[in-house]
Amino acid sequence: MEEEYGDRIRLHWRAFPLIPDEKPGRLATEKTQEGRRRVAAEEPRARFAPPAVGSGLPASSMPALVAAKCAERQSDAAFRRLHDSLFLAQFGDNLDIAQPELLWRLARESGLDMARFEQDYAAGDAYQVALTDYAEGTAWFGVSAVPAVIFNEKVSLVGAVPVERYRAILDWILAGEPGGLVPIPPDEAAAGATLPDAK
């Protein structure tokens, strides 16, 4: 979408920990597999590889979110490189992104200033920044799952939805929000689908 819309849109990533507390021993289930298969079918460019049933899952999402916040302090580009690496590691390669060794390797491979990254990570305040993102998302916008996208602090899409919904909302916003009603792509309107009302 960023490539398609260029500088007409600006994307700002916020942290939303799916597993804020440590939960060791998490294992992939058939539901995990099916969820990843569904997302992969929706967006073929995304690398979603279903994990084997019974394989390990990250014990917490916080270490990776903290690492991403530390990268963001270096630059938006540094954040995007690490974010993309973390995403691919977890969803494409089924690696445990809660493991410090993997986080450090991905940070190095993403070209981060490692001295600064290690200092920021050890300082601990990036953890609080990630929790603040989470609190704001739930309190202000009712976010309860990912992916969640908030458009102009008015409309939210939560969960894996077809890319056409994103386009419809972006086009509506860029056109000045005509009619005050959030649009529904024609094929979904015929099926009776609805989008959340503008807030």
Give the residues covered by each predicted segment.
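Structural alpha/beta surface segment adjacent to cysteine/selenocysteine redox centers
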Residues: M1-F91, Q99
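C-terminal cap of thioredoxin/glutaredoxin-like
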Residues: M1-Y5, I9, S85-K199
